[in-house]
């Protein structure tokens, strides 16, 4: 049975809270299933628990987008990160239709617990690294709109607004 959860709106104060560690009585299998089903339903490549109203330090992501392989990261930590940064487009399920060029490290070493509580250590690069950092930010109470200047954000919001207006015109024809 599918466990799709509704996405929390960007303005919701829950999206600005830094999440502490996972509760000791957390049903990790249930949370993982809700995250994965919701991420798939909304066509995402990553999803943090607070984006669906679960205030626990956990997210799910595709570790290999092409192969559709996923990992679930409970209590994740960034151990080290590359000094080299790369500028790439990013979107977010919390901000549908908004794309921003965000500069992030091109490589990181991370540590997280899997659903069985086992510690996993992993090096990540490229898109996998970007997804991890994006979802990690959600748990820190920040998001990708805070990674760009106000001018760039306002331009992107105007572009998104124009796209929404155009799509409504097409729907009404």
What does each of the following model-derived ranges do?
Residues 1-173:
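Positively charged
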């Amino acid at each position: 049975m599918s466990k799709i959860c509704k996405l929390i709106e960007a303005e919701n104060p829950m999206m600005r809270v830094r999440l502490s560690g996972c509760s000791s009585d957390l049903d990790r299998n249930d949370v993982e299933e809700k995250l994965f089903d919701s991420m798939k339903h909304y066509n995402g490549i990553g999803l943090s628990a607070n984006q669906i109203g679960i205030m626990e330090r956990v997210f799910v992501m595709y570790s290999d987008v092409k192969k559709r392989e996923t990992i679930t990261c409970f209590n994740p930590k960034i151990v080290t990160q590359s000094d080299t940064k790369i500028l790439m487009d990013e979107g977010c399920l919390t901000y549908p239709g908004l794309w921003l060029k965000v500069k992030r490290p091109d490589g990181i070493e991370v540590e997280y617990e899997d659903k069985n509580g086992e510690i996993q250590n992993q090096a990540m690069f490229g898109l996998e690294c970007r997804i991890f950092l994006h979802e990690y930010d959600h748990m820190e109470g920040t998001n990708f709109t805070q990674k760009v200047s106000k001018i760039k954000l306002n331009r992107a919001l105007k572009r998104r607004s124009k796209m929404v207006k155009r799509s409504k015109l097409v729907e009404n024809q």
